Amino acid sequence: MPESGFRTWNGVESFEFVDGVRLHAIGGDQVLLCRVHYEPGKQVPRHAHEHTEQLMAVVEGSVRMTIGDETRELRPGDVVCVNKGIEHELHSENGVTFFEALAPVPLDHVPDKERDLVLAEGGATHVER
């Protein structure tokens, strides 16, 4: 890891997490920060991160999110925490952009599951295992 803690989104390519959902990811030793964008009408089905806690903050648009049995419509300024192992799903009718922080880093948020996320000057890069 570089000595400096400063990072930039510039030059960090997004990748398609699922159809119509793109991530820009920058990681540290124990946490991953993603800028996430859903195209209108897109969703991520019910799932859980068994070993990862997730914080999300909506910055543009809206998303309907279900955590366990509770569903809410999230808009800019709304923040949500999903604890380890809790099932959740998201659907955005009109599109949404949010930031999410995940710790520890889940490999399903890394562009190539057969590679590890490492840091380089100017952003995140990947190396084969």
Regions found by a protein language model. Give the residues of each.
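A short, N-terminal "cap"/entry segment at the start of jelly-roll beta-barrel domains
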Residues: 1-30, 113-129
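Histidine-centered metal-chelating micro-motifs
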Residues: 43-45, 80, 84-89
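Glycine- and acidic-residue-biased ligand/ion/polar-headgroup-sensing regions
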Residues: 51-63
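A short glycine-rich, His/Asp/Glu-containing loop-to-beta-strand
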Residues: 10-46, 52, 101
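Short strand-coil-strand connectors
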Residues: 29, 66-70
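Short acidic-glycine-tyrosine-enriched beta hairpin
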Residues: 69-84
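Ligand-binding loop in jelly-roll beta-barrel domains
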Residues: 84-108
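A cytosolic small-molecule/anion-sensing beta-strand core signal
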Residues: 59-60, 75, 94
